Regions:
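Basic, Lys/Arg-enriched alpha-helical interface segments
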Residues: 1-70, 79-82, 92-118
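Conserved catalytic cores of phosphodiester-cleaving nucleases, focusing on short active-site segments
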Residues: 86
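Residue-level signal for short, function-critical loop segments
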Residues: 89
């Protein structure tokens, strides 16, 4: 099985939204998310529910729960083995907010464009 590498998306002004999100979460949630990221690196696109779910347009969500708090980190696959983490949020409803998916899609397009121009 191919091992995967997690890459944190950075904005054009070098801000890493997922790292900012992680710093804002409590320590238990952060630890759970970190463990799930390790599992994702190992299993990549073979990881399924309850840990990972395909949403649409190449966007997936990493699913984490700690107590009553539910977190999601959206990501996509790039190249042979890269997992690009685009944004994270605390989930308040059963459905993943459309604005979060749209943000992930915008960041995916931005990332791919910047990689093509390297």
């Amino acid at each position: 099985m191919t091992s995967f590498e997690i890459v944190f998306y950075k904005t054009s002004n070098n801000i890493c939204p997922v790292k900012v999100f992680l710093l804002d979460t409590d320590i238990k949630m952060r630890a759970k998310i970190s463990s799930l990221m390790e599992i994702l690196e190992e299993y990549g696109n073979f990881l399924r529910e309850p840990y990972s779910k395909y949403l649409r347009d190449g966007i997936f969500e990493l699913r984490c729960q700690s107590g009553n708090n539910i977190s999601r980190i959206l990501y996509f696959f790039y190249g042979d083995n890269k997992i690009i983490m685009t944004n994270g949020f605390i989930k308040k409803t059963n459905k993943t907010p459309k604005k979060e998916i749209e943000l992930a899609k915008l960041r995916k397009a931005d990332y791919i464009e910047r990689m093509m121009n390297k």
